[in-house]
Every structure is written in C-alpha cells, then in structure tokens.
Amino acid sequence: MILDIHTHKAAPQPLAVVDISFITNHEFKAVDGQLYSAGIHPWDTHRDVTPEEWTRLEELLCRPEFVAIGEGGIDLSGRGGMMFRQLNVFKRQIELSESLKKPIIVHCVKAEDVLCGLIRDLKPTQPWIIHGFRKKPQAARQLLNAGCYISLGQHFNPDTLHAIPQDRLLAETDESELSIHCLLYTSPSPRDRQKSR
C-alpha cells in the first residue's frame, strides 16, 4: 500500500491525505473513506485567526477522518504574514497536534532553523512531516536530526534522497496532476542514480 501523504486534489483520492483549505472551504463535506488534513497555511496569516475559526478547525480535527494537522508552518519567502503571527498560528497548531495526538504536516520555506528551534524548545511528541522538501541534503539532515520526517513530491533534489533513511521518507503529490504511483515509479531510485555516476 502506498499512501500519498499530502495532496490538494479534490476528493475522492484513494490512499491519500487530502489537505482541505480550511480558511476558504466553509462548505466542507467529507467523502466516505477519505483521509484528510486541515490547518492554517502560513500564507493565510496576514490577519488574525478568529476564535470561531480556531473552534471550527478543532472540531474538524477531532473527526476520525482527519488524520493530520496542516499544512501549517513557517514561510520566510515573504508570502506569509508577519513572523510573529506565523509563529503564533503555527504554535497553536502544534498544540492541537499534541492534544489530539495527530501528526503535523509542515510547510517550511527558508525556515529550517526556526523549525529546529521550535522542536528543541517545545519537545513535541507527535511526528512532524516536512512536506514538499526540495532542499539540499544538509538541510534534510538538519531536520532529520531534529526528529522530522521528510516528504518528497514531484520536484526534489535527487541528492537529498540519499540523506533520508527509508523509515523517515514519505511521498506526496501536493499540487501535481500526476498520481502518486506515477511520481514514485518515474523518479530515479537511489540505486539508479549511483549507477549513473
């Protein structure tokens, strides 16, 4: 069984965790048998999250079909809100992850040091899955050493694949139109890349 750990494709998506856009999707209706995640993306932190929105998010995440929090995280590319707001929103989602005992799917752009600092300070017990990872092996090792899992999608640094232990490596389609099977079976394996060197 292969699980697509993070996709934005509309349900139904068998063997996939569908990320719903919590802030914009006010008419959410679950598809039977579908797995979901929900959270507040750092790009949606340009304003304060209302108490009603936090309540609604927690109610969704308490449902059994919601198997993960996120995608949430920190984006220092300039697309997210002010850093203090991103941190406040992400910390609240970390609290939900811990209290509900569900993993958190993390959006991390130019923020590896920030994430590692949060892990060191907060000592979370639930898995952190860094989604859509495209960086070099050194950045992967930094996050792996902090205890994170790494999820690769359609675009990734092939050298990074060597740095990720199999038991910490996940796959995702994210916004790709390709299926998870197509992504996995058309990407070069570490063994194939070693032969080509």
Segments predicted by a language model, with ranges:
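Divalent metal-dependent hydrolysis catalytic cores, especially in the metallo-beta-lactamase
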Residues: M1-T45, V67-A68
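Active-site beta-loop-alpha junctions enriched in small/polar residues
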Residues: H8, I23, G39-W43, G73, ...
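Divalent metal-binding pocket/active-site signature
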Residues: A10, E58-N145
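A short acidic, helix-capping loop that chelates divalent metal ions and anchors anionic groups
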Residues: P42-R47, D75-G81, S179-H181
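Short acidic/histidine-rich active-site segments
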Residues: D167-C182
